Amino acid sequence: MFRIVAPNALIVTDRFHVIRLISQQFVAVWRRIDPVGSKNRGLLSLLRRHASNLRPEQAVKLALYLASHPALAVLYEFRERLNQLLLLRTQTAKACRRLAPILLDFIDQLRTSGFLELQSLGHTLDSWKHEVARMWRFTRNNGITEGFHTKMEVLQRQAYGFRNFKNYRLRVVVMC
């Protein structure tokens, strides 16, 4: 149906969802490497954050933890470099041609990783590599649609048991 309505449209992945997928797989590997540390919610919060968003005392705490787990330190650094690459925006076509081999190298490293979660992530990114690479050129996303959907879900939870669809529809129109 989409191809009929917009035959020349290019699919672009949503940056938020790509970064979230990377973080989820990274945390899954972390749980495998350090099952005890992964239950520490403070460490979980530190490992999920981008390095640029850490306060100095948090950076010290994370550095101490990663120093005691060298394998995690390598994975964390890899994830940070991949995230930095994916967070680039509004690049020229020339810059995108320069960035594409770097992305492909990251994908190859993931696919040849010794961890099943990272291999799966590598295969996923490989199958979506064109759509992921388009994130650098095109900044439009579906954030507004997701926001409306969230508001409608909240409204639906609040109106549980109501049977009048007209009232529900009116509430959606007013909220969104």
What kind of feature is each model-predicted range?
Residues V18-G37:
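Short alpha-helix plus adjacent loop in nuclease-associated cores
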